[in-house]
């Protein structure tokens, strides 16, 4: 199985829901808080074509899910100057 990357934000309940789902499915993943990690925020924006909504789930360098069940939290990237 390929490694998953979860781009999210601690304050976002939808990130928590995706995290819970991944753990329930026993999937290994690396998580990045894009509000604390400027490099992760930039990478997420590159992968999504500039989208600033979390959570974003990436597998093998490709976005496989954006948002959680049609919902997400907007992040602005200003918290990690």
At which residue positions do the language-model features occur?
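Thioredoxin-like thiol-disulfide oxidoreductase module
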Residues: 34-50, 77-79
């Amino acid at each position: 199985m390929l490694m998953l990357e979860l781009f999210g934000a601690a304050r976002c309940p939808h990130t928590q829901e995706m995290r819970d789902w991944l753990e329930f499915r026993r999937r290994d993943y690396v998580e990045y808080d894009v509000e604390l990690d400027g490099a992760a925020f930039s990478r997420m924006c590159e992968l999504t074509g500039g989208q600033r909504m979390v959570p974003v789930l990436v597998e093998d360098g490709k976005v496989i899910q954006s948002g959680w069940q049609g919902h997400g939290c907007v992040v602005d990237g200003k918290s990690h100057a």
